[in-house]
Amino acid sequence: MSKESTRPFPTLPAQIDLPAMEHEVLRRWEEHKIFERSLEQTQGGPTWVFYEGPPTANGTPGVHHVEARVFKDVFPRFKTMKGFYVERKAGWDCHGLPVEVAVEKELGISGKKDIEAFGIAEFNARCRESVLRNVDAFTEMTRRMGYWVNMDEAYRTMDREYVESVWWAIKQIWDKGLLVQDYRISPYCPRCGTTLSDHELAQGYETVTDPSVYVRFPLTSGPLAGQAALLVWTTTPWTLVSNTAVAVHPEVDYVVATDGSEQLVVAEPLVGAALGDGWTLTGQRFKGAELERWTYQRPFELVEFDSPAHFVVLGDYVTVEDGTGLVHQAPAFGADDMQVCRAYGLPVVNPVRNDGTFEEHLDLVGDEFFKTADAALVADLKDRGLLFKHLDYEHSYPHCWRCHTPLMYYAVPSWYIKTTAIKDQLLAENAKTNWVPANVKDGRYGEWLRNNVDWALSRSRYWGTPLPIWEFPDGRRICVGSLKELSELSGQDLSDLDPHRPYVDDIVIPDPDADPSLPLEQRVARRVPEVIDVWFDSGAMPFAQWGAPHRNQEKFEANFPAQYICEAIDQTRGWFYSLMAVSTLVFGRSSYENVVCLGHILAEDGRKMSKHLGNILEPIPVMDRHGADALRWFMAASGSPWMPRRVGHTVLEEIVRKVLLTYYNSASFFTLYAGAGDGWSHEQLADAPAPQDRPLLDRWILSELHSLIKTVDDALERFDTALAGRALTTFIDDLSNWYVRRSRRRFWAGAGTPEGAAAFATLFECLETLTLLMAPIVPFITDHVWQALRRPDAPESVHLASWPKADESLIDPALSEQMALVRRLVELGRAARVDSGQRVRQPLARALVGAPGFAELPEQLRAQIAEELNVVQLDPLSVVGGDLVDYSVKPNFRALGKRFGKTTPRVAQAIREADAKTLVERLRADNAATVDVDGEQVVLSADEVVVTEQPREGWTVASEAGETVALDLELTPELRRAGVAREVIRLVQDARKSSGLNISDRIHLWWSATDEMTAQAMAEHAEAISSEVLAVSFTEGTGDADAYEVVSEEFGITLRLRKA
């Protein structure tokens, strides 16, 4: 027999500092390399692949970053405990506008001119430094929250090997003819000087108020020339400077309306909305197709056109949902405009420069920023009599997702990946993917795929993966897939090249067939100036994290595709999309099988966290106040993770109190009592009766435990941490507030006794298994408790232990149902006692119970009800003739009015005339009842009837859902004395705690009573009192002078005690 197996359990103190405990656990994990060992012991087993979505290292982490990282940690821990090898490689998204904007702020510069004046090489060096600096902050948060991921070998999208892999992927897409340069309308940020992709666009909408103007365009040709004007609506008056045409729908009817002073052409369905009152139709009606090529006077003559323009064109996209049905066309600033005007050979006129300002020579708006030019333009239209109506229009307008500058839709040459060509493949891959929650698949994400547009890949920026395309003066192009290939093409060794701007820009590729007499620039290819969308970087991580295919190809193949990825819901248009798109473009299949989408984390006040509002919670201070486990539990198990949730100190304090400390206190109770007296050891617990031979209460909690294993296992397999959390919370409450409390007397049993062994063994088995089940969600407190509970042959850490398996033979659904009934009846009885104002410790003569299933309860369970309700006798309600409660009912007019309207008075009268007892019984049994209203049976719900109960004198009654408990309130002298004895026991137990006694300490007890009934109670219940308070002597008298004294004036007694 080992010494370890016979040692008492180490005590878990009653009080615990959770953050301090977590720091100690972190130290132990690192010293003993627990994470590394968890990987070592599963290596060679089945693999479960998880991809770390790389956070953008452009600032310090917020508490919302904890959410996704909790989910990234829970499931790999869970799968590892189930024997899977789960390699967890961290990653950092290093490139892109987020980093550039942050560095610009640090340097006190703004815009591309300032960056180029500062120097691209130095600017990019500062970007690299910024990334590395912020990586440290994320690393600290990751460690503190207990997220196990390999930070030492993290991939970084700025590393040479990663960039080479991205180049390889771009070359694959190029070779398939899916990467093209085109002159298209793209979302464009004038401050950043670059286009954005549609998935970036989706992340930056803000609510703004813009002018909504209706403008007259006088007709200059056609049957209405000189008589009428086209009425055009726009919310972007600044684009009127470049007006080229007016589009109408060919099939819509357009009419002429007059107010007596002028005539306006408007789509017939919009006459009322656009013109208002006072307008009549002249009777002239034209199909849109008839208006084609009618010319008009353009609203501004600030820019020159080099070919004919300013006539009506046809566009099927024109609608009659709002506006006037006539749409102003400025092809430089709208994709639909560009498409329609191109078909008519109309010119594209763009007077707005790359920085978003109008060209300086223009009247009215020269050098003005496009959004602020509206006011001057609208005022000029009004002065010239062209402004028909001006309103303020609140709407959602796209802004740059990083610098928050209003975007323009701008005609610029850009590089596009033709993702529209693989739309059907993307939809097919999505159909195979398991989305959590399921509605995202065909909803938010499916809709995004169905409306797929080509991916605007290029960015006119600096800190990013350079687009690996070199172009000769004659337009020939080469796409390069690696530094090795570039070395061969350029004729120099570039294996150590930093593949970023400006260094890669200096590399030229000579044309071997060029005339050597030509100037150098005419004989070499230079790289195009753009870098690529940062989302392509992160979308390439399945292979680029390994540097594949140039290196580690086997590693990539073994880790593709992923069984699991997870991020916030907005990544449906970000990383989730780029991952699927890149892999489908390159490999013909998606790179993931299961994806979890998380709702956003809000501040406690329900608003988005922001520095401006002062409601940001920093993760490290929060964890050092409440503990990381509390924050982890909130993220994983509080409410629905798929919905927005509010986090704050209040909810975290509640988690600590209701979940973590309730669990810990049960474990502390076990170790305290197991160590009391001679103490219990693992060997002694092993000799406990078999589960099926233990008392009913033990069999019940073990049944609940093994049902819990199944529930939590199934929930986590389906990525449902909320269900797992609810089940665990319920069991923790069952264990602490029912099982432990109901079993307290058995925990006093001496070592080696069957009743004590059964109780201790059952509680140990529950705590051990509960600790295993909670470990993936709250890894700190469970590993701390594990150290106290650990069997001699158990792993050093709970995170090295195996996931528990349910024993179906111990699951007893019938017993679970019976115990649930017992607890419902106890709650009803307690409610009845509270209503009566009677003390909880005052025994009552009897309780009467009316409930389906009560008659079948075994005596042990009936005894539990009696003891919990503190009654001497428990009988069925049927033993009492007549009713113990008088009922009255009346209508709830507020609830009835919502449903019945004008017929409410007749329904209310039917309720008054109904038999109250029958109506209440039906409502409580079925949550619904019928009444006769003018010969028609009307179904009422419970909230539509107000029920008043009046118990008969001497009784208190509580009922719910067809179950009733009635308490007899008549007190005999014997019951009163028993109640006093209970109060005395409470006084002594409180005194034991206050005097610093241990739970197993025996005492000497002296008492003296001035109240006659109290004195009688002490004499009558001396044995019971002594047993409960561990008194080896029970003496009437004053006792030792140095004994601990308690005086109760209420019960007229003085108590003194000291340790025996």
Curated annotation (Swiss-Prot):
Q: Give the principal location in a single coarse category.
A: cytoplasm
- InterPro entries xrefs: aa-tRNA-synth_Ia, Anticodon_Ile_ABEc, Ile-tRNA-ligase, Ile-tRNA-ligase_type2, M/V/L/I-tRNA-synth_anticd-bd, Rossmann-like_a/b/a_fold, tRNAsynth_Ia_anticodon-bd, Val/Leu/Ile-tRNA-synth_edit
What compartments host this protein?
Cytoplasm
Q: Which domain of life is it from?
A: Bacteria
**Which keywords appear in this protein's UniProt record, sorted alphabetically?**
Aminoacyl-tRNA synthetase, ATP-binding, Cytoplasm, Ligase, Metal-binding, Nucleotide-binding, Protein biosynthesis, Zinc
Q: Where is this motif: 'KMSKS' region?
A: 608-612
Residue numbers covered by motif 'HIGH' region: 55-65
Task: Write down what this protein is called.
Answer: Isoleucine--tRNA ligase
> Which residues hold ATP?
611
* Signal sequence region: none
UniProt xrefs under HAMAP family: Ile_tRNA_synth_type2
Record text about domains: IleRS has two distinct active sites: one for aminoacylation and one for editing. The misactivated valine is translocated from the active site to the editing site, which sterically excludes the correctly activated isoleucine. The single editing site contains two valyl binding pockets, one specific for each substrate (Val-AMP or Val-tRNA(Ile)).
